[in-house]
Amino acid sequence: MNGGVSRRALIGSTLALSAVANGAEAQPLKRKLKIVVAGGHPGDPEYACGGTVARYTQSGHDVTLLYLNKGEGGCPHRSGQECGAIRTAEAQKACRILKAKPAFAGEIDGQSIVDPAAYGKFRKVLEGLAPDVLFTHWPIDAHPDHRAISNLAYDAWLHMAAKPAFYYFEVSDGEDTQMFAPTDYVNISSTESLKREACYAHASQAPDHFYPLQRQVTAFRGIQSGYSQAEAYIRYVKSPGGLLP
């Protein structure tokens, strides 16, 4: 383990101890919630939050996986249109596994636009979904589409009259997501198998390579938080809390 990972582990472990001391194991949610997980591409919400999504839907809550684009650039030797169709079908399959709903924001893979018009368009999409809880990418990320939807989601949150709880997630930690020091953890020990199945629904995206790496992350987050497997989040400091499963 290199020095950078060790520092992140130390920071995360300190926060985890604080979270456990303050009762990190969530209490049952008493009302039906609407949850939106906003990711850059098909597969991002599943890899980041699949276990958390399964816990929500198993408890009867409504979850929408909102993809910024259809992943048109993710299939070597295929056209963008063909790849987008393949990955849309994979996203729909993953959502069926997690009992979530798919939605697409209409941008193009690798060509994300973040300007006043894009902010307004995304805000309308999010307001139409009216989430009680919003998850999106941590903005310090190597992928421009991840940074784009993070900024779009944050701007929408700032302008929403009824502000949802707002959490950032991690993907491909150390490769895409950078400098991620969690504030909250969700125990996914009972739902990791569903997360795995949903991630493997994205068959065009080499899950045999990427899922074992992601499972190392959730195992590490489990060590930090006292669970077998956990997904980690950063709650925006001005966000409501208490709505994690």
Predicted regions and their residues:
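Metal-dependent de-N-acetylase/amidase catalytic core
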Residues: 12-13, 25-38, 108, 113-245
